[in-house]
Amino acid sequence: MTAIKLIVGLGNPGAEYEQTRHNAGALFVERIAHAQGINLVADRKYFGLTGRFSHQGQDVRLLIPTTYMNRSGQAVAALAGFFRIKPEEILVAHDELDLPPGVAKLKLGGGHGGHNGLRDIIAQLGNQNNFYRLRLGIGHPGVASMVSNFVLGRAPRAEQEKLDASIDFVLGVLPDIFAGEWNRAMKNLHSQKA
């Protein structure tokens, strides 16, 4: 049972990307920081916004890379390397085209599925892909050629409300995630209705 020591929220930096679908992971980490009453601060050493809190005596670090999505691994590798955090102690939250809005799923390992942030993290961790992923459903535009504009666009209010509700649900299973109770966390999360 592996406890999580680092939670990464993927997104793109800058006000123009703040509320876009591609920043679902960053939104998740912001919500954790708010719930824990901590501020995320810019740290050039780790190429991102960072924060730290303690859960039952265990340090948990938060990271939102301030690199663009396709360089997210630079931030993850810098922070994980400095604090000697193993890939299996990392949870990466990211937007997921293959899940509808309002659905969130946990997964250990696997490929990048075309997600440039995951692709770079895997590469920067020395081709190790055995980190946990929180896949936050954003839906799919239906046509591959529309994906880029879709993920970089803002979700309509109804879709955003579903994403917010799924993040709230995940926040409720965080104690299991922090404790390394992955089977229980997955069972609870995967029984959620969109």
From Swiss-Prot:
Hydrolyzes ribosome-free peptidyl-tRNAs (with 1 or more amino acids incorporated), which drop off the ribosome during protein synthesis, or as a result of ribosome stalling. NCBIfam families: pth. The keyword Cytoplasm applies. Its EC number is 3.1.1.29. TRNA binds at residues 17, 68, 70, 116. Belongs to the PTH family. Monomer. It is found in: Cytoplasm. Keywords: Cytoplasm, Hydrolase, RNA-binding, tRNA-binding. The active site is at 22 (proton acceptor). It catalyses: an N-acyl-L-alpha-aminoacyl-tRNA + H2O = an N-acyl-L-amino acid + a tRNA + H(+). GO terms for biological process: protein quality control for misfolded or incompletely synthesized proteins; rescue of stalled ribosome. SUPFAM superfamilies: Peptidyl-tRNA hydrolase-like (SSF53178). It is an enzyme of class 3 (hydrolase). This is Peptidyl-tRNA hydrolase. GO terms for cellular component: cytoplasm. The gene is pth. One of its GO terms (molecular function) is tRNA binding. The record marks 95 as: Stabilizes the basic form of H active site to accept a proton. The record marks 12 as: Discriminates between blocked and unblocked aminoacyl-tRNA.
